[in-house]
UniProtKB/Swiss-Prot annotation:
This is Asparagine--tRNA ligase. The gene is asnS. Its EC number is 6.1.1.22. GO terms for biological process: asparaginyl-tRNA aminoacylation. GO terms for molecular function: asparagine-tRNA ligase activity; ATP binding; nucleic acid binding. InterPro entries: Aa-tRNA-synt_II (IPR004364), aa-tRNA-synth_II (IPR006195), aa-tRNA-synth_II/BPL/LPL (IPR045864), Asn-tRNA-ligase (IPR004522), Asp/Asn-tRNA-synth_IIb (IPR002312), NA-bd_OB-fold (IPR012340), NA-bd_OB_tRNA (IPR004365). It is an enzyme of class 6 (ligase). The keyword Transcription regulation does not apply.
């Protein structure tokens, strides 16, 4: 005998008038004398199961009475359409099998503090809003990979353990690697995915990345996921066009397939419907002027001298002036990574762009045209104080058939936070890793 249910909540409309078995967990229960209403969730949705005392055995009614929040059970009954019911359908209960009891479930309908909920993250993911956020996360990841695959990209997996820093920073998690010294958890797969680009033309990597940054902002995690495409024979303008098509396709897919989850989150869908190409573009110079002209509108967005990078308040201020994501391009080379191609007409700035999401969500993509001249790349490695011997393999990519190429990295959690309207990034990943959190 199979333990699998004969239907799911997501497919219940196909079974009106039929006898089915559902399997799931009790989300909520209401007793009204001889009637017991069980709101059952099965991972695909929720449905109201109506237990009428006169229609079931004494044992079944007693089981219904004994069910508590998050008890697991199998419920058999007849499917009935009812506009008044949550989701438009109900199950008239005939039999209930208690599979796993739940005693004093800690997350109750009352308000709980964030620390309590994070300590119980393994249970919190069952709640309606967390379920909706993580459903949308899964959709974003699927949409991103499927779109790239359809565009002819090849997934190219890159190592998580590396011998060097990709971006020349000290914010690395280190571990001992046998007799070879230190290894580091990858900050990005970009350098390695460039090798794949030389083989396949259009590639991407997808996986976890790690930053040992002592930051406690609502935008930062120490472990997060990135998808990083790289394209041969592509310049800075090609790169921005690819990004706006990519992001727009992801948002459209979520609107098409996860609209009900967005409603659970009370997301203003009209704002997402505006996310269509082309995205506005401003230069770093223009952004500096914009910040100076609108100082005081966003707390902490004080005027910046030319040459300084933006903080979160500056990104919020810039993005507030646009109704969709905005590119800020041509940053000073000094505040960007060593591998970014200088503008040939103005070498002090790089052919790069950050894509800022509206509504205060900040940078969701960082990208650039890469340096393809081996001599210039070697100069930049030295100028950043990096050990040349650590990057010989990376220089080889320029020594043997170099081509202009571009790419970008998109942080999954920041995109999910923006699309779902989630204020803090910790809710956009199943088990967030932060400065003061590594449990559960």
């Amino acid at each position: 005998m199979s333990l699998l249910p004969t239907a799911t909540v997501a497919t219940i409309a196909r079974h009106v008038g039929q006898r089915v078995t559902l399997a799931g967990w009790v989300y909520h229960k209401t007793e009204k004398g001889k009637l017991i209403f069980i709101l059952l969730r099965d991972g695909s949705g929720t449905i109201q199961c109506v237990t009428f005392k006169k229609n079931v055995s004494e044992a079944t009614f007693a089981t219904a009475q004994a069910l508590t929040q998050e008890s697991s059970c199998r419920i058999t009954g007849s499917v009935r359409a009812d506009e008044r019911a949550p989701g438009g359908y109900e199950l008239d209960v005939e039999e209930i099998e208690l599979v796993g009891p739940s005693h004093e479930y800690p997350i109750t309908p009352k308000e709980h503090g964030v620390e309590f909920l994070m300590e119980h993250r393994h249970l919190w993911v069952r709640s309606a809003k967390q379920h909706a956020i993580l459903r949308i996360r899964a959709e974003v990841i699927a949409a991103a990979q499927e779109w790239l695959n359809e565009q002819g990209f090849v997934r190219f997996d890159t190592p998580i353990l590396t011998a060097t820093a990709a971006e020349g920073t000290t914010n690395l998690f280190a571990t001992d690697y046998f007799d070879l010294g230190k290894a580091y958890l990858a900050q990005t797969g970009q350098l390695y995915v460039e090798a794949g680009m030389m083989s396949f033309g259009k590639v991407y990597c997808f996986g976890p990345t790690f930053r040992a940054e002592k930051s406690k902002t609502r935008r930062h995690l120490t472990e997060f996921w990135m998808i990083e495409p790289e394209v041969a024979f592509a310049d800075h303008e090609d790169n921005m066009r690819l990004q706006e098509q990519f992001v727009s396709a992801i948002v459209a897919r979520v609107l098409d397939r996860r609209r009900e989850d967005l409603k659970v989150l009370e997301r203003d869908i009209s704002l997402l419907e505006q996310v269509v190409p082309p995205f506005p573009r401003i230069t770093y110079d223009q952004a500096i002027e914009l910040i100076a002209a609108h100082q005081g509108e966003v707390e902490g967005a004080y005027p910046l001298p030319w040459g300084e990078d933006f903080g979160a308040p500056h990104e919020t201020l810039i993005a507030s002036k646009f109704d969709r994501p905005v590119f800020v391009e041509r940053f000073p080379s000094a505040v960007k990574a060593f591998y970014m191609q200088p503008d040939p007409n103005r070498p002090e700035v790089a052919l790069c762009a950050d894509l800022l999401a509206p509504e205060g969500y900040g940078e969701i993509i960082g990208g650039s045209q890469r340096i393809h001249d081996p001599d210039l790349l070697e100069q930049r490695i030295r100028a950043h104080g990096l050990r040349l011997e650590d990057y010989q393999w990376y220089l080889d990519l320029r020594r043997y058939g170099t081509v202009p190429h571009s790419g970008f990295g998109m942080g999954i959690e920041r995109v999910v936070a923006w699309i779902t309207g989630t204020r803090h990034i910790r809710e956009t990943i199943p088990f967030p890793r932060q400065l003061y959190r590594i449990y559960p």
